[in-house]
Structures are given as structure tokens and as C-alpha cells.
Design a protein with these regions (language model features):
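C-terminal amphipathic helix plus adjacent low-complexity
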Residues: 190-255
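Short loop/helix-cap segments at secondary-structure boundaries that form the rim of catalytic
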Residues: 28-29, 41-50, 63-67, 105-115, ...
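Short acidic active-site motifs
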Residues: 124-125, 187, 211
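Donor-nucleotide binding loops and adjacent catalytic segments primarily
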Residues: 56-132
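Nucleotide-sugar donor-binding patch of glycosyltransferase catalytic domains
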Residues: 110-111, 154-197
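Hydrophobic/aromatic beta-strand patches that form the interior of the parallel beta-sheet core
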Residues: 33-35, 51, 98, 119, ...
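A donor-sugar binding/catalytic signature common to diverse glycosyltransferases
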Residues: 123, 128-167
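Active-site-proximal region of nucleotide-activated glycan assembly enzymes
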Residues: 1-52
């Protein structure tokens, strides 16, 4: 999606954004088609070989029973954000918080007190707790934001690098979440009050499998026909070359 002309980049960091696009182009070199995963249908760009498709979410995220519980859930790519969460929690000890972090040396559950718990990353537990939270705060990873959006959870995005900056800006522009520079849960609670579930995204996502399969099949057909035409043209060229050699030979023999 970073190569789609309609995607607006944040514009904060020109060099990292240029490098992100450059790296994306390198990964696409030689591709017959480029599948751009997006929370919205930006429309295909045939000139650039870009086909826009919904995110490919795990089936469990789409079928799990969900409800709005009494706690706020979060995910931190950078464990350093834990201090922000603790600082906010000290001022609001009655708000229940469950945060997942990438801290391998931490216990499975680090219970700070009755209303704040840090959890080591566990996919099954993460999904179950997301399904039951009332709001979700995260460092703007694309997949987790899309899962929360599908479940109808208000999201606060705290980007930690340029790719997440792009994800966060895109999500905020599409009213899928709000962006913050830190884990200020007050902002998330305010956003959640007026939040309405994004039914349009859910409908878009429900067609992910058929759209992606169709795009792959179309790319294969395009590649196959291209190779077939190339082989046909090479065969014709060889016949023409052979004919040009035969004609002079006949003239010599006739002479």
C-alpha cells in the first residue's frame, strides 16, 4: 500500500519515508502483481500493478465471541512505554488495565496491583482479552489494529517508527482510531465515548479470502500468458532467422 498514489504519507520524516518506499519497491521487484493490504478500498492501480485487497486476518479473530468488558487492553512493542502506563495508572487506580508487552524475561503475568497487569505475548490469550475489552491501545501494528477494528473496539495508536506512523495516519483519516504520542488513556476513554463500530470495514474484511485468491489467480494467468506469448515470439524469431539463412543457401545452389 505504501506505493499506492492515493496513500498520503505523514510527511514528518522525509528520509525514512523515502527509504520505506524504496525498500517496498525492492521487495516487489519482478512481481507480476502487488497486493496492497488496506483497511479501505483505495481502488486498484493497474499502471503500477497494484491490487488493493482487505487484510488477511486469522479466522479466530473473526469468529470469537466478543463483548465490551470493563477493562482497557493494550499492546506495547517497546517495553519502555510501561512507565507511561504506570504513571497514568497511579492517577487513575480504579480503571482496570491489561497490557501485553514483548518482555521475554518477565513472568507470564506481572500483576502490579488489583487493576494493572502486564502480560507476556500469548496469541490465544491476547485474542481472548481483546474480544472482551472496552478499548484498545497499541503501538500501531497493522494486524492488531485491524483485528480490534473488526471486533468493534475503539483504538488509540502510538506509533514507534515510520511504518507505524503511516498505519496510524491512515487509520485516523479513516476514523478507525485516534493517534497519540504516548499512552495517555484519558484520550482513549474520550474517543471511546462517541465511537461507533465500523460495519463497513467488517463487510470489506469478510471478502478478504475471495478477493485475495482471485487476485493471485489473475496474477498467475497474467504471468502464464506472458510467458506463453514470449515463447511464441521467440519461436517466430528463430523461424525467421532460419529462413533468412535458407534463402541465401538456395541462391548459391541455383547459381
Amino acid at each position: 500500500l505504501f506505493l499506492h498514489p492515493s496513500l498520503q504519507m505523514p510527511g514528518k520524516y522525509s528520509v525514512p519515508e523515502s527509504l520505506l518506499k524504496f525498500f517496498t519497491r525492492i521487495t516487489c521487484m519482478g512481481a507480476t502483481a502487488k497486493l496492497a493490504l488496506s483497511i479501505r478500498d483505495y481502488g486498484d492501480e493497474p499502471v503500477h500493478g497494484i491490487k488493493v485487497v482487505p487484510p488477511l486476518l486469522r479466522q479466530e479473530a473473526k469468529t470469537i465471541i466478543r463483548h465490551h468488558g470493563d477493562y482497557i487492553m493494550g499492546y506495547m512493542l517497546n517495553a519502555g512505554f510501561a512507565e507511561d502506563v504506570k504513571a497514568w495508572h497511579e492517577k487513575h487506580p480504579h480503571t482496570r488495565l491489561h497490557f501485553f508487552w514483548d518482555q521475554p524475561d518477565a513472568p507470564e503475568e506481572l500483576k502490579v496491583d488489583d487493576t494493572l497487569t502486564f502480560h507476556r505475548i500469548n496469541d490465544e490469550k491476547f485474542l481472548k482479552m481483546m474480544a472482551g475489552c472496552k478499548a484498545f491501545a497499541t503501538t500501531a501494528g497493522f494486524e492488531s489494529v485491524c483485528e480490534a477494528l473488526y471486533m468493534g473496539k475503539p483504538c488509540m495508536l502510538i506509533p514507534a517508527h515510520v511504518e507505524q506512523e503511516c498505519n496510524a495516519m491512515d487509520a485516523e483519516r479513516e476514523m478507525a482510531g485516534m493517534v497519540s504520542e504516548d499512552f495517555d488513556i484519558d484520550k482513549l476513554k474520550a474517543f471511546a465515548r462517541d465511537y461507533e463500530e465500523d460495519v463497513e470495514f467488517r463487510m470489506w474484511e469478510n471478502h478478504a479470502e475471495c478477493r485475495i485468491v482471485a487476485a493471485i489467480e489473475n496474477a498467475y494467468e497474467t504471468y502464464y500468458h506472458r510467458k506463453e506469448n514470449q515463447a511464441y515470439e521467440e519461436e517466430n524469431d528463430s523461424i525467421v532467422a532460419a529462413s533468412s539463412l535458407v534463402v541465401p543457401a538456395r541462391r548459391v545452389w541455383q547459381g
